[in-house]
Structures are given as C-alpha cells and as structure tokens.
Regions:
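C-terminal segment of classical bacterial N-terminal signal peptides
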Residues: 14-18
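Lipid interaction determinants
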Residues: 2-9, 19-148
Length: 148
C-alpha cells in the first residue's frame, strides 16, 4: 500500500513538474506589455513623464515583436527563451513631430531596442516584468513593463 502511494505521489510530482516547465517557456509572449519605467541612469528616477504615460507598449508573438515607442510603431524579429529576449532585426517608423515626454520615451526605447540587443527577462509575477540589457556594466539599463 505504501509503495503504491509513493508511486502515485512521484507520478503526480513529475506530471506537475512538466507543467511548470511549460509555463516558464512563454517568456513575454501573448500579452500586451505597457512600458511603465525606463532605468538608464542610476541618478535618474525611471518613471515616465506624465504626458508619455500609457503611450509605449510591446507585444511579442512567436518570433515577432510589435511595439509603440510613444511616438512611432516599432517592429522587430526576436529570439526568446523564458529568461532572454534578443532582437534580430528592428524597424522603427518616422517620429517627426513627436515632442515632450513621448519623444523622451521614444528616444530612450529606440536607443535600447536595437538590432542585436539582448535582454535578461525577469518576470516578477504574471503582470510585471523587467527587461535588463545584457552587458558587463554595473548599472545595466532596463525597461519595466506591466501586462494589460
């Protein structure tokens, strides 16, 4: 009886472990992620300017990312795992006439979201994540996003 109970427990643990592994492989795919903070300088708060709040977002589906920089659409081909996002090709539309906080967010995002850029992805929970630039720098730039 005890052996049967242990076998059932082991089988359930392996099944649940397999499910947990599948959940981790999605990375940021499937949700629309709103950019809520940009951390590029340790001496500067990362919050977005009031006139730019809610204007920048990104969505990843398969090997494609569609984003809005606050001023212009951005499209990229990506490679991803649950812990890494790498941009392969990036196209950004013209942002002429964009000013103020939205322009600041646009300029910051387009300086980070470049071909070859890689980010460590850290999901804080199902609705919040950070994308931190992969580099040897001590204070690596990062993008904080919230799922809509």
């Amino acid at each position: 009886m005890r052996k049967a109970a242990l076998a059932a427990f082991a089988s359930a643990a392996l099944t649940l472990g397999g499910c947990a592994g599948d959940a981790d492989t999605t990375g940021l795919s499937g949700a629309t992620w709103q950019v809520v903070a940009l951390y590029t300088d340790p001496g500067t708060p990362g919050g977005l300017p009031a006139d730019a709040a809610g204007r920048a977002s990104l969505r990843i589906a398969g090997d494609s990312m569609n984003a809005m920089t606050g001023c212009a659409p951005l499209r990229a081909k990506v490679e991803q795992t649950s812990e890494r996002l790498t941009l392969v090709d990036v196209e950004v539309a013209d942002a002429d006439g964009c000013i103020g906080g939205s322009r600041y967010v646009h300029d910051t995002l387009t300086s980070l979201l470049t071909p070859g850029a890689a980010f460590d992805v850290r999901k804080l929970n199902d609705k919040e994540a950070t994308l931190t630039v992969v580099s040897d720098a001590i204070d690596r730039p990062s993008i904080r996003v919230m799922a809509l």
